């Protein structure tokens, strides 16, 4: 095993980048960077039937968007390649042959139907399903007979009996498995493709991976991988298994869970900021010292401590994600937020598909109005409904405000002044409201609340003069005149 910290994120291109996988990649990245080590991306693409055409590209694209820059992968060979499992058969085959020659593995000719019948019988007896070793000691004659029948063999690893496999997990502490509870398992499928637990151990060894950090759904894979290391006399890496991510019902995050968006692509499409998503994911199952929760990537690298990875499940808190992204939104320059929001405004037909300079200028003012409230760029559409829809029916509280005794006088003065106002801009509108205050003697809530309700139909909202400017003179005058 390498003295240098070398970790890997090894996705299958069978789907897009999931929040859970993004977290695995992120913690591996932080661990490597904290110790000035290497972050390696290896593509486990042996499941040809399930691989998506753009699955690999999507993984890389979204990792890059999140800010997870890798040191080695298919595009950066550092002498440990190939970095796609499908291109490593020449590495696996001599090792498979060695295990067969040393009788540490054997060919199994049982059919899927026979294996399923065995499994069902074991379950019916209340036993844990496991392979019973029927083909563990075939004679050469028996093997030839099965091959004459056209049976294709898988290759099984011969599990040593009465042995304990232990490892000191960096998150969970000491974990042990009794080998007698593990049946002889398949290392090469009937189609000649190595299985996950075999290939991953070989790859980790030859790529000199020092630490394997992954979700705790992989704990049961670990003894099988340790068996492979021991069979070849290799030193296993250190293992760390992160707690699951759970939803509001404290159930494991499932890809079928419609309450939570689960793919990085979806957050990109909605206009979340990559540095905000990085920050939020980094706090899913890990916590810094102190109360602060907003950190830059560089700060996370500096303070990351694997000892602070949590044993307890990590709660995916949608409200917290909204809060974190809002913190970053507030700090961003308006132009960046506007460019993120523009596709959403166009999609909602609020800005033309080919916008004029006037449209773009108006859009920038709209964003400036709501930027401090936005949880994500796409939220500009529901937030700014009052600019595009008819005035909503007033609620009871709004009715009380607009029916105030001084409202007709207030609206009459304001209407006449705004009608004559040029340019119709926030600074001038603010002066105009002050003039109305002096002329009428109406001030404070009695001044501002009726104006806001009259032009927006709402009791609260962003800066009133800016809101009036963005609404535009025609719309504002139409709304004011009904209350004169």
From Swiss-Prot:
Localization: Cytoplasm
One Pfam family it belongs to: Anticodon_2
Annotated GO biological process: glutamyl-tRNA aminoacylation
Binding-site positions, ATP: 255
Function description: Catalyzes the attachment of glutamate to tRNA(Glu) in a two-step reaction: glutamate is first activated by ATP to form Glu-AMP and then transferred to the acceptor end of tRNA(Glu).
Source lineage: Bacteria, Bacillati, Bacillota, Bacilli, Bacillales
Protein name: Glutamate--tRNA ligase
Family per similarity comment: Belongs to the class-I aminoacyl-tRNA synthetase family. Glutamate--tRNA ligase type 1 subfamily.
Source organism per UniProt: Staphylococcus aureus (strain NCTC 8325 / PS 47)
């Amino acid at each position: 095993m390498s003295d240098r910290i070398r970790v890997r994120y090894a996705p299958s291109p069978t789907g897009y980048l999931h929040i859970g996988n993004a977290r695995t990649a992120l913690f591996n990245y932080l661990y490597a960077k904290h110790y000035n080590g290497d972050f390696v991306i290896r593509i486990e693409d042996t499941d040809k039937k399930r691989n998506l055409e753009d699955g690999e590209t999507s993984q890389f694209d979204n990792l890059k968007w999140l800010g997870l820059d890798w040191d080695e992968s298919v595009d950066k060979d550092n002498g440990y390649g190939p970095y796609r499992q499908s291109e490593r058969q020449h590495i696996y085959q001599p090792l498979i042959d060695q295990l067969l020659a040393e009788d540490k593995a054997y060919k199994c000719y049982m059919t899927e139907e026979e294996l399923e019948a065995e499994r069902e019988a074991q379950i019916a007896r209340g036993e844990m399903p496991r392979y019973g070793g029927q083909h563990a000691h075939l004679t050469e004659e028996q093997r030839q007979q099965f091959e004459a029948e056209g049976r294709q063999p898988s290759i099984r690893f011969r599990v040593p009996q009465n042995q304990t496999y232990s490892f000191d997990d960096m998150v969970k502490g000491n974990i042990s498995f009794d080998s007698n509870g593990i049946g002889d398992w398949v290392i090469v499928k009937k189609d000649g493709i190595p299985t996950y637990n075999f290939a991953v151990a070989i790859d980790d060894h030859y790529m000199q991976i020092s630490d394997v950090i992954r979700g705790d759904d992989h704990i049961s894979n670990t003894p099988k991988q340790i068996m492979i290391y021991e069979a070849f006399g290799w030193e296993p890496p250190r293992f760390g298994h992160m707690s699951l991510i759970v939803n509001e019902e404290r159930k494991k995050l499932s890809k079928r869970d419609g309450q939570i968006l689960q793919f990085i692509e979806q957050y990109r499409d909605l206009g979340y900021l990559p540095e905000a998503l990085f920050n939020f994911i980094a706090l899913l199952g890990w916590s810094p010292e102190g109360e602060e929760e907003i950190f830059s990537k560089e700060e996370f690298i500096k303070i990351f401590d694997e000892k602070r990875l949590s044993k307890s499940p990590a709660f995916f808190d949608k409200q917290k994600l909204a809060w974190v992204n809002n913190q970053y939104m507030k700090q961003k320059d308006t132009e960046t937020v506007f460019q993120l929001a523009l596709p959403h405004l166009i999609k909602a037909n609020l800005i033309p598909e080919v916008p004029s300079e006037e449209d773009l200028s108006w859009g920038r003012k709209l964003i400036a109005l709501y930027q401090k409230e936005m949880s994500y760029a796409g939220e500009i559409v529901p937030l700014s409904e009052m600019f595009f829809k008819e005035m909503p029916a007033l609620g009871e509280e709004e009715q009380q405000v607009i029916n105030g005794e001084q409202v007709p006088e207030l609206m009459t003065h304001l209407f006449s002044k705004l009608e004559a106002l040029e340019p119709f801009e926030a600074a001038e509108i603010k002066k105009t409201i002050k003039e109305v205050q002096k002329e009428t003697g109406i001030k404070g809530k009695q001044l501002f609340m009726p104006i806001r309700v009259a032009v927006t139909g709402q009791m609260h909202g962003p800066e009133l003069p800016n809101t009036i400017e963005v609404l535009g003179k025609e719309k504002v005058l139409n709304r004011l005149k009904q209350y004169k």
